[in-house]
Structures are given as C-alpha cells and as structure tokens.
C-alpha cells in the first residue's frame, strides 16, 4: 500500500472513531431522570440499574445516581452506603494510565472508567451530610439523634 493511500485510509477512519465516541451518558439515563422528576423512584432505580454497571466503567455514576434516588426516597442509610462506595471508587480511580486516557479520549469517554469531576466528589460529601441530618430528624431517641449528627 502506498504511503498516500495509507494516510487517506487513516484520515477516513479517524472521523468514524471520533463519531463513535459521541455517545453520551445522558442518552442511557434519560428515562430514569424523568422518573425521578415524576417522583417514581422505584422505576427510576430500576432504569439506573439497567443503564449503568455497578462494576464496570460507570460504577461511580451507578453508585452516585442510586444514592440520590435513595436520598429522595428518604432512605438515608442506604444512600450513605452507596455514597461510601462511590467515595472509595472515586479515590481508587484517581490514578489513571496515560495510555488508557489517550485511547479513551480518542474513542469514547465511556470506554474507560469514569473517575468523577471534582464537583462530583464534593457532591458525595454534601449528600452524605444531608443524609446524616435526615437521619437525625428521623431519630426516635436522643442517642440516635446525636449519633446521626456526629456522622455529619
């Protein structure tokens, strides 16, 4: 194959690779978000579980999204369990491979593990604090109230 032909072949394939990378996170969870807006948390949870993988590349988003659904349902303890997992996942994903990052950037951001943006890491602790305040409000005795506030 001639050098010019190789260059043209690569030039023709590059847009295909880049366009394949345009799949967005939002397309997979639109239905779940709509259910949250309607207050149908059970349906939303099922759709998030179907759209996101708890052990795959989007495991951070899986735990964060479900934690918010649990928070909105008023299940503050379950929300905190999910947020604790999300926090550990975010910390584990802090270290990334340069090669893996370049390949992910060139193809599809959802092909590599998502480590979360800085504001999302703050979001984890913000919701944990809200959950502890919610637990304090639901506490039936003084010790439960203080234990929940101490967690915040």
Regions found by a protein language model. Name each.
Residues 20-43, 50-54:
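Bacterial Sec signal peptide processing site at the extreme N-terminus
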Residues 48-49, 83, 90, 145, ...:
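Inward-facing hydrophobic residues that define packing positions of alpha-helical scaffold repeats
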Residues 57, 118-119, 126:
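Residue signature of alpha-solenoid helical repeat architecture, marking inter-repeat boundaries
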